[in-house]
Amino acid sequence: MSYAYDDQNIFARILRGEIPNKTVFESEHTLAFHDIHPHAAVHVLVVPKGRYVTFDHFAAEATAEELVDFHRTAARICAMLGVAPGDGGSGYRTIANAGPDSNQEVPHYHLHILAGRNMGRLLP
C-alpha cells in the first residue's frame, strides 16, 4: 500500500521546531502536546516522530521500537495527567482518525487523548 506523506503538514512542522507547542512529554520516537483547540478539559495529541499518515501506515511500517515507544508514551501521558483508571483517574478516551470518512484533518498519524469529563457515547 502507498501513503503520500506531506512534510508541510502542521505536525511535521511542529516536530521540526518550526511551530511552537505546549509539550507534555517527549521521547525518542514520540512527541505529546496539548491540542490548541481542546474538545475536553484534557486534550493531548500523541504524535510519532516518523513520517506516518494513518494508524494502518504506522502499524505496517514503523519499527518495533517506534510502536512500543508510541503506545507506552500514550499510557504514560494518561498516568501523568491523572486520568488513567489504574492510577485513580476516572478515565479517558483515545481517538485516531484515518482518511476522509473519519474527518482526519492532519495527514500525520496521531492519537487524541481526551479526558476530564464524561465523554458520553462515541456514536449515537
Can you annotate each of these PLM segments?
Residues M1-P124:
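HIT superfamily nucleotide-processing domains
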